[in-house]
Regions:
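Domain-level signal for soluble alpha/beta catalytic cores
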Residues: 1-455
Length: 455
């Protein structure tokens, strides 16, 4: 509730809230102090809108590093004075833009703005980076990747800086762009998130079942920062109805559902945090069930489990110009009508996964693959399999796919392993592994198993 507290402290309309870190740091420090004195163990920097794209609104885009480092400094000063055991989470909020194909921003441009902010926060000395209030899984993927890269570049590990991914869900239990909690969790866990959670939009009672859904697919720590109830518009003012006394007990079901880190978002005053802290510390949470690892792929909206314990899955392989002269020519002409029709026909026929191959002779696969991912991710809920041997085409597909894709495929050859494995790890993809080496399939079962194990 930094924004609400800043408004109460005199934030004027049109003034950048994050500029307080530089021009009025004593105001920010006082806000931090109030939360620390009321039970906060982690405080969040005043940097929710301190990425370059957001600071452009105030013509401050050239001061990203200065503002973020100043924010960490004032938070650390408050901790040193009021609660030395507390830790600092560097806040990175949404850019306010949508990525292609929902909007006009490229993945790389969103990545770059988060990378710049993450580098500054890490340089300042945060204990966590908290990517929060995100409503689009592609924006989260870009922010997470930027944070991981910034951490690596600084020579840090997750023991030094943990990365928290917090989505914001609507009353229907999905993000505004349609992603449910289990799908969102699967995607960011595969990419390397350290903590996964929810903040904003909803109150504790509405968020509890969503935390349960997250806990059903991961063993990672879970964070939760609800609003002080569902927002209400009273006399043209947004009001959050839960009192401090009411909110504390309502957080206990969230803890029992699996949340490790709990706090508050909009409308939560220092008194709310004190109520939450007292309730949680006096409560013995239920033991969280251990989740057995599973192979899961997703689209933006749908989760699909693979394995010997599931039904046989059908992969539709019509989206492939090999041996299809008409499709190949249409792709040369820039037409994706047949691609989209093939996708819909295969889904209607029962395909569980759609294989996407853009290998047209004499053409660069990369722009074709990018266009195919944009078109298909907007058209069908069915998860996609990326079918290419071209590393550039594979990367553009994995980067722009709003889910956890399946890569088709990797084999036992060194070149295949060194090209495909790093991309799968970076973008959190699942792998279809073929027990083939030097173009040959071993005749004996034990040789195939040995090759698979080596992969």
């Amino acid at each position: 509730a930094m924004g609400t507290m800043l408004q109460a402290a005199g934030l004027e309309e049109g003034y950048c809230p994050e500029l307080f870190n530089v021009e009025k740091p004593e105001v920010v420090k006082n806000i931090h102090a109030q939360y620390l004195q009321h039970g906060s163990d982690v405080i969040t920097t005043n940097t929710f809108g301190a990425c370059g794209l957001k600071l452009e609104d105030y013509d401050l885009q050239d001061r990203v590093r200065e503002i973020n480092i100043a924010a960490v400094k004032v938070a650390k000063e408050a901790i040193a004075e009021f609660k030395p055991s507390a830790r600092v989470a560097g806040s990175m909020g949404p850019t306010g833009r949508f990525l292609q194909p929902l909007g006009n921003m490229s993945f790389d441009s969103i990545y770059d703005t988060y990378r710049e902010q993450a580098e500054a926060l890490i340089e300042g000395g945060v204990d966590f980076i908290i990517i929060e209030t995100i409503i689009d899984v592609q924006e989260m993927r870009a922010a997470l990747l930027a944070s991981l890269d910034a951490r690596d570049a600084a020579g840090k590990t997750k023991e030094d800086v943990q990365i928290i991914c917090q989505f914001s869900f609507s009353e229907d239990g999905r993000t505004i762009t349609g992603t449910p909690p289990a799908v969102a969790t699967t995607i960011v866990e595969a990419m390397g998130a350290d903590i996964i959670g929810i903040n904003c939009s909803l109150g504790p009672e509405q968020i509890t079942p969503l935390i349960e859904e997250i806990a059903s697919v991961t063993n990672l720590p879970i964070s939760c920062q609800p609003n002080a109830g569902m927002p209400q518009l009273i006399n043209k003012q947004t009001v959050f109805p839960l009192t401090a006394e009411e909110m504390g007990p309502l957080m206990l079901p969230i803890v029992d559902a699996g949340a490790t880190y709990v706090g508050g978002c909009c409308g939560t005053t220092p008194a709310h945090i004190q109520s939450i802290s007292e309730a949680v510390k006096a409560h013995t949470p239920k033991e969280r069930a251990h989740i057995e690892p599973k192979t899961i792929i997703t689209s933006r909206t749908k989760l699909l489990e693979l394995g010997h314990h599931t039904k046989p899955l059908i992969i539709g392989e019509r989206i492939n110009p090999t041996g299809r002269k008409i499709l190949a020519q249409e792709l040369r002409d820039g037409s994706f009508i047949r691609v989209k029709r093939d996708a819909l026909d295969q889904v209607e026929a029962g395909a569980d996964i759609l294989d996407v191959n853009m290998g047209v002779a004499g053409m660069d696969q990369t722009p074709l693959m990018e266009r195919a991912i944009f078109e298909l991710s907007m058209l069908v809920e069915t998860p996609l399999s990326i079918d290419t041997l071209d590393p550039a085409a594979m990367e553009v597909a994995l980067k722009n796919y709003p889910g956890r894709a399946l890569i088709n495929s990797v084999n036992g050859e060194e070149e295949s392993i060194t090209q495909v494995m790093p991309l799968a790890k970076r973008y959190g993809a699942a792998l279809l592994c073929l027990p083939i080496c030097s173009g040959d399939l071993p005749e004996k079962a034990e040789d195939r198993v040995a090759l698979a194990e080596s992969i």
